[in-house]
């Protein structure tokens, strides 16, 4: 059995979860990138891995119907958000309906994994994470919860949303899919090595990591028994962030990402609204971080209607990328 080409693989893990014989496992290459391998002794050529692969199965995307600049009406929520707090508003709406929320979190070893919560642990979803995240058992867990009737929201990278859609094969009415405007992802080992370098240099143990500070990009590490970080490096001085923003350390698939386009594979797309006020005056008396929210499907429209009263929002029309309002380098 042949999986997709390695340079196109996003390391989502759908193939491993779909295999009934546990014949697929992940292997890390010499550069720290993880890719699936098939144990030929266990494989029975059933083809379920290929049917669950979003690279091998084309998905229809949707042009955003509406675009908004959004920030949470809750000032305390905004203080703990690295953007405008749109994701937090979405999570709280699902929790209110006894639903389950999925997103990327740091575990106790500062490794990024996708987790699901049905309580106020959603605080763990906050904080930017500029690294690849492992899905683990997320595919199977979400499938079972959807079948049990729970409302589920999944917020992840476009390739992870596409992977979940392909794995499920059914458009569950109780599933809200939200993708993040992505810049590309380095493997976890690069971040691990960067953290360990500073831990050894400073003789400190890092318990908390941050990539944002006052709406600027900083690499910060903090111990649990201290107030101030023992490392705080601006992105122009930090090798991890510098290589991230210069697009030097991503998975191969990121450099030819088929989801980096106007057509979105999710119900809703969120990200940072860079450049707000540069084209037209922003007269709302608010100077904090702002989220961009793109509504892509009828389900997205319906869900966003449920949370509008918890946001301050400004309607803008979806438009092509403008280099003057972008903080990210273009691949064009």
Where are these regions (language model features)?
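Short, flexible loop segments at boundaries between secondary-structure elements
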Residues: 178-194
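Intrinsically disordered, low-complexity linker/loop segments enriched in Gly/Pro
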Residues: 127-172, 187
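Hydrophobic alpha-helical segments, chiefly the membrane-spanning helices
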Residues: 327-332
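A short alpha->loop->secondary-structure connector
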Residues: 170-180
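Iron-sulfur cluster-binding cysteine motifs and their immediate structural context
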Residues: 8, 14-31, 35-37, 47-64, ...
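Flanking helices and flexible, charged tails adjoining ferredoxin-like Fe-S electron-transfer domains
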Residues: 41-148, 317
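A conserved active-site cap/scaffold subdomain adjacent to cofactor or substrate pockets
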Residues: 202-297, 301, 311
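Conserved small/polar residues in nucleotide/adenosyl-binding loops
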Residues: 315-324
